[in-house]
Curated annotation (Swiss-Prot):
InterPro entries reported for this sequence: Cell_div_FtsL
Protein name: Cell division protein FtsL
Lineage, highest ranks first: Bacteria, Bacillati, Bacillota, Bacilli, Lactobacillales
Its job: Essential cell division protein.
GO CC list: cell division site; plasma membrane
Keywords: Cell cycle, Cell division, Cell membrane, Membrane, Transmembrane, Transmembrane helix
């Protein structure tokens, strides 16, 4: 078994010796390039996930603000109901004049 391992090691050494320095440099550069590309892909995927997460948070905040705005508009509409204004005017012995009512947006 040890002889077989030794023979395999010798075969690999012989094959490596067969390659010239240029070929070794070429294969080394391919390996380094492959490694750099793999690391870059992982980095970009991580950044993409972070951006998607940030986008989701911002969209949630936008929806929350829209809901707050809709609630505020609803409250303004409820406060400007004609019946409510008449009740307030009557309770303070005032006369309701519709020309003096303005809606702020």
């Amino acid at each position: 078994m040890a002889e077989k391992m030794e023979k395999t090691g010798q075969i690999l050494q012989m094959q490596l010796k067969r390659f010239s320095r240029v070929e070794k440099a070429f294969y080394f550069s391919i390996a380094v390039t492959t490694l750099i590309v793999a690391i870059s892909i992982i980095f970009m995927q991580t950044k993409l996930l972070q951006v998607q997460n940030d986008l989701t948070k911002i969209n949630a905040q936008i929806e929350e603000k829209k809901t707050e705005l809709d609630d505020a508009k609803q409250e303004v509409n409820e406060l400007l109901r004609a019946e409510r204004l008449k009740e307030i005017a009557n309770s303070h012995d005032l006369q309701l004049n519709n020309e003096n009512i303005r809606i702020a947006e």
